Amino acid sequence: MPAVEHVEPSFPRLNGTEEQVTWSMVEYCRSVLLLKCQNLSDGQLKRRATPPSELSLLGLLRHMTKVERYWFQRCFLGSEEGPTYSTTEHPNADFDDLDSIDTDEVVARYVAACDLSRQVARTHRLDEIAVLQRGGEDVSLRYIGVHMIDEYARHLGHADLLREAIDGSVGG
């Protein structure tokens, strides 16, 4: 059974408040990443791009789990949770050693990280400042939302190419 079976696409709002448009775009990006992983086997999710790239759809899910947790839990809330996958010593671990990885667990961790991020977005204003600074500067939740759109946009392009190489599927 595929780790990601059925995903309802979440389309972004075309109008509304800044908050509504920002979070609907982030939500859209999350749903597209899951759509790119939908109905694929473990082997297909672990399939790497053309060398020397280490990218895979499963690696992208692991990476975006880390990104969600870092920006919403660690940076904004100040959570002391340790690294999700990569560490200072092993910065590319999101994409490495996938052969023995349980894909269902990776998907569950991604979904859980997104749920926690949604909770932060629902209960805080865009102009609120994160607990942690970056480069000595305050970080607003607004910045985090925009950064998430940028981060997803970069990796959704990768996901498009990876999925097309697996089974010819395009769009999303």
Q: Where are the regions a protein language model picked out?
A:
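Short, contiguous alpha-helical
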Residues: 1-12, 19-92, 132-172
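Acidic/histidine-rich alpha-helical segments that form the ligand environment
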Residues: 92-131, 142-148
